[in-house]
């Protein structure tokens, strides 16, 4: 079968975001073509899934297949950010630790089984646009470069061609063809420029051996505050072990070991700074190379436009501390499917549908960015009680938002509690070691734009975030008013997703009727 000359919806990229979007849209009877530049199975890091994946897979009838595959069940995880404190999430609800080459291929094949025409080894090189004739203003996380109408592709066997389409889903990963080549709107978070090294081990000591939490993921902050380490047990008998640290501190560490220091040596030094993980690995054997990759966090000023949607890493990426990447990819893919189908069905205008998608993606990024910033700051400060009250020696409250109940819908109060916690953390940082300039805390009156911490107000929180992590102007809005209030936390049911109204539109998650309702 060859790539067709035209389709209704072109999905560029066959990773989790693209495959999920293609499956959801094809199941609605749409003519969908999915093009993946690589060949499955292909390696990818990012093995630890959140419980929110299960209801998302359930919606496209894929949960049972994932469950039957034999992936390591993830009943929870522990986060030890300082030398004294340990927090966890679970055990209500579960997810999996996956081998991404296997899980990504399952998703890709499911898109084909759902009715999408799926091709591998096909790369999108360029996109053609034409003017969009209807009113479509820039702003509010959307952009109008024109309407994409066709794409030029090439294959690994040397063939090439063009494919025309009515809608485009950009799921091209960090390449992000729309953001980087056409919109040129990707912005890096200067405070979250990290570098990761990782490898795979066998014969380690399971974490929490002999307890109900045995062999669950474990994350530990380095004692020098440079970053954090992970251990994620996999069903193939290996354990994924890695370290994430600020890029400048990584090279400082490498320099201290000598100019010829290898990543294996650097990993060994990181394990010394994560003593619990170091003990777990004492009898273990490294069975892979130590890999390295930049781990820069970024976002964009727009995630949609006339007849196109941007999903997953093609739009935004955050430090992987809370397994955010895969969740944002799949949740964003569902948002793309909902909004495109709504546009096709005439539930609303294309401008309204695309703006809904863009804001939905931005909200997910916002929630994770807020908590990741607070967690990383705790790691860097170590003994200062940023993520726990002075009289509390645990992080359970901090990670409550990662503990979905099987049938519980998150309320405004639930989300507000999470936000209040993060605001409390940021304000503690100010009390500990920050001198906030007056001009950074001027702005909205307390309480006007949402939840406050009781005395400082949202504008001060925005200033704290800007000072704390050198946020871009766009990212300062993350804490400016805390507009997440009433939006869905990453939870255990699709009610969290479906029950959220944006600009008077709510998602309608019914097979055969996927779209948006006006409320």
Curated annotation (Swiss-Prot):
Residues 1-21 form the signal peptide. Its EC number is 1.14.14.-. Keywords: FAD, Flavoprotein, Monooxygenase, Oxidoreductase, Signal. Pfam families: Trp_halogenase. GO terms for biological process: secondary metabolite biosynthetic process. GO terms for molecular function: flavin-dependent halogenase activity; monooxygenase activity. FAD binds at residues 14, 17, 47. Radicicol is an important pharmacophore as an inhibitor of heat shock protein 90 (Hsp90), an ATP-dependent chaperone involved in the post-translational maturation and stabilization of over one hundred proteins, and which activity has been implicated in diverse pathologies ranging from oncology to neurodegenerative and infectious diseases. Disulfide bonds: none annotated. Pathway: Secondary metabolite biosynthesis. Chloride binds at residues 324-325. Flavin-dependent halogenase; part of the gene cluster that mediates the biosynthesis of radicicol, a resorcylic acid lactone (RAL) that irreversibly inhibits the HSP90 molecular chaperone, an important target for cancer chemotherapy. Within the cluster, rdc2 is involved in the chlorination of the resorcylic acid lactone (RAL) structure to convert monocillin I into radicicol. Also chlorinates monocillin II to produce 6-cholomonocillin II and monocilllin IV to produce 13-chloromonocillin IV. Belongs to the flavin-dependent halogenase family. This is Flavin-dependent halogenase rdc2. It comes from Metacordyceps chlamydosporia (Nematophagous fungus).
């Amino acid at each position: 079968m060859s790539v067709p000359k035209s389709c209704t919806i072109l999905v560029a990229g066959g990773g989790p975001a693209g495959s999920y979007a293609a499956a959801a849209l094809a199941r609605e009877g749409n003519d969908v073509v999915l093009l993946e530049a690589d060949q499955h199975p292909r390696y990818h890091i990012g093995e630890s899934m959140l419980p929110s994946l299960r209801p998302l897979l359930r919606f496209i009838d894929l949960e049972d297949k994932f469950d039957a595959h034999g992936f390591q069940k993830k009943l929870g995880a522990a986060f030890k950010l300082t030398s004294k404190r340990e927090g966890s999430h679970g055990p209500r609800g579960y997810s999996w630790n996956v081998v991404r080459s296997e899980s990504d291929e399952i998703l890709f094949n499911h898109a084909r089984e759902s009715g999408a025409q799926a091709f591998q080894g096909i790369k999108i090189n360029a996109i053609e646009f034409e003017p969009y004739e209807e009113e479509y203003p820039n702003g509010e996380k959307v952009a109008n470069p024109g309407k994409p109408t066709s794409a030029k592709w090439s294959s690994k066997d040397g063939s090439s061609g063009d494919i025309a389409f009515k809608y485009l889903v950009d799921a091209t990963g960090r390449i992000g063809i729309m953001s980087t080549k056409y919109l040129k709107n990707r912005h890096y978070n200067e405070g979250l420029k990290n570098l990761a090294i990782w490898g795979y081990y066998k014969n380690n000591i399971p974490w929490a051996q002999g307890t109900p939490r045995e062999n669950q993921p474990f994350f530990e902050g380095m004692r020098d505050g440079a970053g954090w380490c992970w251990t994620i047990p996999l069903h193939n008998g290996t354990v994924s072990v890695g370290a994430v640290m600020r890029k400048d501190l990584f090279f400082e560490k490498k320099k201290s070991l000598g100019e010829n220091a290898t990543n294996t040596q650097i990993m060994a030094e990181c394990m010394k700074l994560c003593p619990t993980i170091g003990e777990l690995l004492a009898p273990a054997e490294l069975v892979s190379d130590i890999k390295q990759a930049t781990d820069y966090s970024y976002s964009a000023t727009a995630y949609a436009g006339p007849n196109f949607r941007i999903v997953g890493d093609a739009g935004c990426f955050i430090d992987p501390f809370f397994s955010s990447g895969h969740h944002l990819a799949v949740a964003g893919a569902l948002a793309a499917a909902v909004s495109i189908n709504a546009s096709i069905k005439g539930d609303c205008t294309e401008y309204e549908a695309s703006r809904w998608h863009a804001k939905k993606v931005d909200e997910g990024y916002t929630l994770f960015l807020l908590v990741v910033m607070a967690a990383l700051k705790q790691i860097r400060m170590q003994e200062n009680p940023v993520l726990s009250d002075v009289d509390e020696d645990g992080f359970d409250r901090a990670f409550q938002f990662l503990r979905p109940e099987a049938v519980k819908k998150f309320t405004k109060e639930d989300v507000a509690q999470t936000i209040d916690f993060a605001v409390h953390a940021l304000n503690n940082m100010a009390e500990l070691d920050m001198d906030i300039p007056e001009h950074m805390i001027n702005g909205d009156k307390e309480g006007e734009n949402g939840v406050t911490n009781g005395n400082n107000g949202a504008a001060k929180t925005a200033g704290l975030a800007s000072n704390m992590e050198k946020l871009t102007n766009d990212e300062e809005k993350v804490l400016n008013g805390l507009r997440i209030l009433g939006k869905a936390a990453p939870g255990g049911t699709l009610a969290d997703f479906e029950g959220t109204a944006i600009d008077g539109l709510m998602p309608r998650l019914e097979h055969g009727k996927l779209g948006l309702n006006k409320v």
